[in-house]
Amino acid sequence: NSAAGSGSDATEEVSAGTTGEYTVAQVAKSCMPSVVSITNASVKTVQDFFGGVQQYPSESSGSGIIVGQNDSEILVATNNHVVADADTITVAFDDDAVYEAQVKGTDSDNDLAVVAVKISDMSEDTLKSIKVVSIGNSDELEIGEQVVAIGNALGYGQSVTSGWISAVDREVTDEDGKTTGKLIQTDAAINPGNSGGALLNMQGELIGINSAKAAATEVEGMGYAIPVSVAQPILDELMNRETRYKADEDHAGYIGVTCLNVDSTSAQTY
């Protein structure tokens, strides 16, 4: 899998200081072309009080990171819970262009997924505006290191927050009682819609995939990200799966079966 666009195609070059680190503004400028907004649309079926069935359209927002490209697709990493149960998925890129995407692969145990956007659907302007993120090494993180989070907070579009590495190898129990793998803890603001977005070091490299926050009135500044060193081998496997595109109604198959209630006469006949 190769890069979607060079840094010079996507953004003006920014130079690091003598320490080899960028400012927060420089990290944002360099890396926002690698981060996308994801919208998950579905129809929820609910049984009402009288035994009938009601259908309600549902829409949720998340984030994603451009992690690769093959001959025909731009590949975007995100959280599994961002795309789970979707009827349709759309991806908004840095130039605000929106394209339909398909799930390429998911790993629910690690809350990771890859979605694919067909290059043939995309304009030249969009392709020139984006780039594949640079991958860092989350195994080398130090507590107190500054980081930048980019994501689609509250579905409003891309926003940037900054903070510090608060802890590493943090295991968290979710509301279902499931204990996560070892996560990066940061006080950079991680809000609904940030899931699947990028946690970056000050060299502009991806070090984590934002996935959760502690939500309670007495809690502040406790966000969590999947370390990229954990995520990368899983994403590599998902990226190399075959994308299964949904057929439209004109090409959808059918099994030719009609269902009937079985009465006593039918039972005796068959």
Region annotations inferred by a language model:
Residues S2-Q268:
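Serine-dependent protease modules
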